[in-house]
A protein has these predicted regions:
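Well-ordered alpha-helical scaffold segments within catalytic/enzyme domains
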Residues: 177, 244-253
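Extracellular/oxidizing-compartment recognition motifs
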Residues: 1-233, 240-241
C-alpha cells in the first residue's frame, strides 16, 4: 500500500496496512502515516468520470528494467545515517531488502553529490528546483527533495521498491535502520524506455570512450516514454534539450 504517492518527490508505504480487503484512501500528510495512525476517518476513493476518447496501446516501447546497479560502498557520516554509493548516476528505483522489527520506519533520500563532510547533498535532486518553503499541497515538504519512507511489517525479509515514482541519483541516504546495513541491503534498478541500440562507438582514446559511456547512460536516464530535460528535478520533454541532443541520440538508439 501507499499512504503518500507523488511521482516527483516520492512515496510513503506502510507495509502494516496490507489486508485482503479494499482499503480506504486519501491524500494525506506525512504526520498521518505513522505506525500508530488511526485511519477511521479516511474517505473512500471516488469513481472517476467515464473516459472520453479512444483507448489504444502506446506506439513506443515500454519502460523496462534494463540494469541492476550494486552498491559499491557504504559510509556513516553521522551516527545512524548511512550513505550508499552506487558508483554511477542513473534513473530508476532503489530495491530495499530488510529484516527488521514491526513498525521500523526507514527513510531513503537521493542525490547526485555529497557535501564536504560526506553527508548527502539532496539539493542536487529537488523537484522543480523548490529549495525553500513554498505553497505546496497536503504532504508537500518545504524543500522538495526526493525521498521514500517504508514502514516495516516485521514478518521476515521484506523487499520494497517505490513503484509509483522513480528517482535519479548516485547516492542514497538511509535513516531509521536498526543496526548496520550491508551492500545487499540496497540495490539500484535502472529503468528506461526500452529503445533498441542502433550504433556503438569505441576508439583508442579512453577519455573519448568515457564520454561516450556517460552520454549513453544520460540518454537512457532521460527517456521515460519521452526524452526529458532531466530525470529528477523537472522531468519534462522540453524541445531545447531534445533538439541539441537528437543527432547523438539517434546515432546510438532507435
Amino acid at each position: 500500500p501507499s499512504a503518500l504517492s507523488a511521482v516527483r518527490i516520492g512515496t510513503n508505504s506502510p507495509a502494516r496496512a496490507r489486508s485482503a480487503g479494499p482499503r480506504p484512501a486519501r491524500y494525506v500528510s506525512h504526520h498521518s502515516t505513522r505506525p500508530d495512525c488511526n485511519d477511521a476517518d479516511w474517505a473512500h476513493a471516488a469513481i472517476a468520470a467515464e473516459l472520453i476518447g479512444k483507448l489504444q496501446a502506446q506506439p513506443l516501447p515500454p519502460i523496462r528494467l534494463t540494469a541492476t546497479i550494486r552498491t559499491v560502498k557504504i559510509t556513516e557520516p553521522r551516527k545512524g545515517t548511512f550513505i550508499f554509493d552506487m558508483g554511477q548516476n542513473f534513473a530508476g528505483w532503489p530495491m530495499l531488502a530488510v529484516n527488521v522489527p514491526t513498525g521500523t520506519q526507514i527513510t531513503l533520500r537521493y542525490g547526485e553529490l555529497l557535501n564536504k563532510d560526506g553527508t548527502l547533498n539532496p539539493m542536487t535532486s529537488v523537484c522543480g528546483q523548490i529549495k525553500a518553503a513554498s505553497a505546496g499541497g497536503p504532504g508537500a515538504p518545504e524543500v522538495a527533495w526526493q525521498s521514500d519512507t517504508y514502514i516495516a511489517k516485521g514478518d521476515g525479509i521484506e523487499v520494497y521498491m517505490p513503484l509509483f515514482t522513480f528517482h535519479a541519483f548516485r547516492y542514497v541516504e538511509m535513516t531509521g535502520y536498526p543496526g548496520t546495513p550491508s551492500v545487499a541491503t540496497l540495490e539500484g534498478l535502472r529503468l528506461n524506455t526500452d529503445v533498441a541500440e542502433v550504433g556503438t562507438f569505441a576508439c583508442s582514446n579512453e577519455l573519448l570512450n568515457r564520454i561516450q559511456t556517460m552520454c549513453r547512460w544520460t540518454f537512457l536516464s532521460n527517456i521515460f516514454s519521452v526524452q526529458s530535460d532531466c530525470p529528477h528535478r523537472e522531468r519534462f520533454g522540453y524541445g531545447g534539450d531534445l533538439v541539441t541532443t537528437c543527432d547523438a541520440f539517434m546515432l546510438n538508439y532507435d
